[in-house]
């Protein structure tokens, strides 16, 4: 799946707010390196660097376009390309921070357990994931894909990502390994300029696998059909803007010191 840093940062303030909220719940760290998993263009990495300047910091991402943007943003910081599915967590980390990446990995709880095992005593695993598959913004992606005009391109392919496990599942799997685990949902309400702004937002994330699956000459038609559905699902408010509802799941697990 391809990514575009330029598309992603069109809504950088809105995308970075959950990272700020997650980082605010991370306690002081012991000595040891910190890792920003799925660092994207480096917006979350910058927050970690400002909060924990004394911990060596490494950004990890699978997409070279994102890494190029991150390296330009934070000159001299270490960034590495890796696919988290096959990535082996280095032992002795003080922090594994992951903002909006694990929702793409169907069996990510297994990896979360390995991350906790790799933490030093007192280290923290901090995770945020969009939990918005039941929102119109995402339901309409699949609905559009199932239309006769586009269905052939998606035949035999699973495009829609797997729903997140329940909060209880995360607690049950992680609690035996840590001193404290907190799991919570936050729902953000983003006022955006128009329904087209919602389309632009999801073009940077949720729509990517759908667009990648389509032939290049069909993407414009798919986007037009999807945008029309979005306009009906998100009517304008009195000032002309629309309100994007965006639920997110947060996990902070702290290992015993």
Swiss-Prot record:
Its EC number(s): 2.1.1.144
Reaction catalysis annotation: trans-aconitate + S-adenosyl-L-methionine = (E)-3-(methoxycarbonyl)pent-2-enedioate + S-adenosyl-L-homocysteine
Name of the protein in its database record: Trans-aconitate 2-methyltransferase
Enzyme class: transferase
Pfam families, per the entry: Methyltransf_12 (PF08242)
Any Gene Ontology CC annotation: cytoplasm
GO BP terms in the entry: methylation
Gene3D superfamilies (UniProt xref): S-adenosyl-L-methionine-dependent methyltransferases (1.10.150.290), Vaccinia Virus protein VP39 (3.40.50.150)
Source species of the chain: Sinorhizobium fredii (strain NBRC 101917 / NGR234)
Nucleus found in the keyword field: no
Major site of localization recorded for this protein: cytoplasm
InterPro entries: Methyltransf_12, SAM-dependent_MTases_sf, Trans-aconitate_MeTrfase, Trans_acon_MeTrfase_C
Keywords annotated in UniProt: Cytoplasm, Methyltransferase, S-adenosyl-L-methionine, Transferase
